[in-house]
From Swiss-Prot:
The protein's role, per its UniProt record: Protein S19 forms a complex with S13 that binds strongly to the 16S ribosomal RNA.
Record protein name field: Small ribosomal subunit protein uS19
Organism of provenance: Neisseria meningitidis serogroup B (strain ATCC BAA-335 / MC58)
Lineage per the UniProt record: Bacteria, Pseudomonadati, Pseudomonadota, Betaproteobacteria, Neisseriales
Bilayer-spanning residue ranges: none
Pfam families: Ribosomal_S19
GO BP: ribosomal small subunit assembly; translation
Family under the similarity heading: Belongs to the universal ribosomal protein uS19 family.
Name of the encoding gene: rpsS
Amino acid sequence: MARSLKKGPYVDLHLLKKVDAARASNDKRPIKTWSRRSTILPDFIGLTIAVHNGRTHVPVFISDNMVGHKLGEFSLTRTFKGHLADKKAKKK
């Protein structure tokens, strides 16, 4: 279910403060955050945000195609190891 337009996008206040500080100082270091639920705003374009995936912080470079999505969409939490090969096909 989508968020109501009258409410606007959700962004954690501490993340917004860090982004504003990085923009003001022209800092290129990644911004660490645990806020996977925050929406990507146009102010974030060009910054690298390290999003926590439960184990490590995954660096995500924000481009204009990502605006409107959530940060957690770009930091995968599960590792796909692949399906096992069919044993019948291996024998032949």
